[in-house]
């Protein structure tokens, strides 16, 4: 398995629609103001967070159960910023829609800008032939409120290409998150 370069990422996005919308260079500023970078980097793609958030709340004193998840555990927010309460959690989604090739596994890592502020981004691997908007999980590990910026970089995708295509892809087995759009809650 080898990590793929900016040239490969650019080609796959432009010729095969692997990432849409696609930004073919790294953006660090917009309209004379600094932003948290997004777009193609040397060996990855920095994704942006859309302006749709679900912030974890304890208003209804629900129990967090991944097999029987109560949507009332979240408050929906549509904004250019999201404030995550101390020691809490929020979900969002990428601006970008992904179509992962059959011989590629994609790993997502949080950006250091957020990690150095105590904000952890978690995403499980994007499996071969998975497609959709990526649901992003943000954990605020601090005892202070934390801010997430929509339409700016939040995580980096690394593309690992195998020597051979897998026998059974995510699409083949009818994965439960295939084709997801919007912020997607747990499914069983």
Swiss-Prot record:
Question: Which GO terms of the molecular function aspect are on file?
Answer: dCTP deaminase activity; nucleotide binding
Q: EC number(s) in its UniProt entry?
A: 3.5.4.13
Keywords annotated in UniProt = Hydrolase, Nucleotide metabolism, Nucleotide-binding
The residues that the entry says bind dCTP are: 111-116, 135-137, 156, 170, 180
Instruction: Tell me its family.
Output: Belongs to the dCTP deaminase family.
What this chain does, per the entry, is described as:
Catalyzes the deamination of dCTP to dUTP.
Q: Spell out the protein name for this chain.
A: dCTP deaminase
What organism does this protein naturally occur in?
Ectopseudomonas mendocina (strain ymp) (Pseudomonas mendocina)
């Amino acid at each position: 398995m080898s990590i793929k370069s900016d040239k490969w990422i650019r080609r796959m996005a432009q010729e095969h629609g692997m990432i849409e919308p696609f930004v073919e260079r790294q953006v660090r500023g917009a309209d004379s103001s600094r932003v948290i970078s997004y777009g193609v980097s040397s060996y990855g793609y920095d994704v942006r967070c859309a302006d749709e958030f679900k912030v974890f709340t304890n208003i209804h004193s629900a129990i967090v159960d991944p097999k029987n998840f109560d949507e009332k555990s979240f408050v929906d927010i549509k904004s250019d910023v999201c404030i995550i309460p101390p020691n809490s959690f929020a979900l969002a989604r990428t601006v970008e829609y992904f179509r992962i090739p059959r011989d590629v596994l994609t790993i997502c890592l949080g950006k250091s800008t957020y990690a150095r502020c105590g904000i952890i981004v978690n995403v499980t691997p994007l499996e071969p032939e998975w497609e959709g908007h990526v649901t992003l999980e943000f954990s605020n590990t601090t005892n202070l409120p934390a801010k997430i910026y929509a339409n700016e970089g939040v995580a980096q995708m690394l593309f690992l290409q195998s020597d051979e295509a897998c026998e059974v892809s995510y699409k083949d087995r009818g994965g439960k998150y295939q084709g997801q759009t919007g912020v997607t809650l747990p499914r069983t």
